[in-house]
Amino acid sequence: MARAIMFQGTGSDVGKSVLVAGLCRVARNRGLKVRPFKPQNMSNNAAVSDDGGEIGRAQWLQALACGVPSSVHMNPVLLKPQTDMGSQLIVQGQVRGEARGRYYQELKPQLMAAVMESFAKVGDGADLVLVEGAGSPAEINLRAGDIANMGFAIHADVPVVLVGDIDRGGVIASLVGTHTILPQEDRAMVRGFLINKFRGDISLFDDGLAAITRFTGWRSFGVVPWLKAVSRLPAEDSVVLERAVRGDKKALIVAVPMLPRIANFDDLDPLKAEPAVEVVMVPPGSSLPADAGLVVLPGTKSTIADLLALRENGWDRELVAHVKRGGHVLGICGGFQMLGRRISDPAGIEGNVRDIEGLGLLDIETMMEPEKVVRNVEAVSLLHDEPLEGYEIHIGRTSGPDMARPFARIGDHDDGAVSPDGRIMGTYLHGVFSADRFRHHFLRALGVEGGQMNYRESVEEALDELAEGLEASLDIDGLFALA
């Protein structure tokens, strides 16, 4: 079994995913064969792994940081929330059904075998495996049968480092409180802690570090400052969208309704990186900005439920007004399905609504079907005759007159639809804006001169900068010696 270290957090969104990605790049730069692993993830921001299954987008990024192909075994259990009470369950990349609250808690012990099998496969041939926990180990109400945090750490005998987020405040209480709450067996797995997202003079927190060590007996592995490189990396948790605020006005405003079950929102990251583009995330209760040149309807884990939510917010009427003003619309995956005249779900795959009128902006209809399409694809944009690389993760089959004007060509078949005037577009492809030449042509058609940024190179550069920041701020030798 490969050497391993596990990073658990005092809560969600403390920066574990990015931290592990950065440490993966640190280890790679030091010449180690390093691999990422996350036993259980809950996210609608999924990726298609290089071996053809679904994993969390964070593990895809971590594999990139390691310089290795991504694998379903890097995230053997993925939960994709689709209602307030239930999630789609993905095991080793494949759909295994729906998991609801208490039923999933009873199911978790059975999933440990799959988790350990995947952990062994990931570790085969590796020098080091960097493991990411989920949420917080202090959620002791979920401890029985745990596969995400201490349950896994004990079962696999992997030492744990706790990560605290000082930016949100209360980091001393979070770490000391976690120490207090953890059962003795779990507490014994913790070898130390580190502080993430510090702003200002780090020396001002010296007394804080000493206090945490005094209360817990845990050693400090350092304090990570607020690193600008993080903002240039894909985010996995939608909580980051909730904190988005408008900046200085740019040449093109791209408005994105924040649907309750928004998925694969990292489709927008290449647009956010363009200097002439401002991506505005529009929260429920707010109006679509009247100065938007483009509205993007993003992917969603539940198309019908989010279409109902879109109407409840009045965004359907605002979208029609946007089009009448001459604005453009792009629907991606579930957003593409919403743009049509009708969505039918006779088998109740998404819930109790079996048939619903769409937005009517494209002359298409969608029929929900049980078979799920999960694949990486190479395509050609038929709008700009430029190559595309992306992926599909969806259920449903779409047809109709506007499909005669497809968005892209994938092998021997067409994808998506475009309205007769070219201003309404839809596609099942995720990741289209990562294609630099397509993105530049797309923006130019909207009257904006795109930058010359190579998006993939910018992500690689951000990972390198992140690794440099971690090398400078953490006791890397001490951390890696834990394994």
From Swiss-Prot:
NCBIfam families: cobQ, PRK00784.1
The keyword Membrane is assigned to this record: no
Domain GATase cobBQ-type intervals: 251-438
HAMAP family referenced in this protein's UniProt entry, alphabetically: CobQ
Family per record: Belongs to the CobB/CobQ family. CobQ subfamily.
Organism: Brucella suis (strain ATCC 23445 / NCTC 10510)
Transit peptide is among the record's keywords: no
Underlying gene: cobQ
Pathway annotation from the record: Cofactor biosynthesis; adenosylcobalamin biosynthesis
Superkingdom of origin: Bacteria
Keywords: Cobalamin biosynthesis, Glutamine amidotransferase
One Pfam family in the UniProt entry: GATase_3
High-level lineage: Bacteria, Pseudomonadati, Pseudomonadota, Alphaproteobacteria, Hyphomicrobiales
PANTHER family assigned: COBYRIC ACID SYNTHASE, DETHIOBIOTIN SYNTHETASE
Protein purpose: Catalyzes amidations at positions B, D, E, and G on adenosylcobyrinic A,C-diamide. NH(2) groups are provided by glutamine, and one molecule of ATP is hydrogenolyzed for each amidation.
GO biological process, alphabetically ordered: cobalamin biosynthetic process
Active site as annotated: 333 (nucleophile), 430
GO MF annotation: an example: catalytic activity
Protein name: Cobyric acid synthase
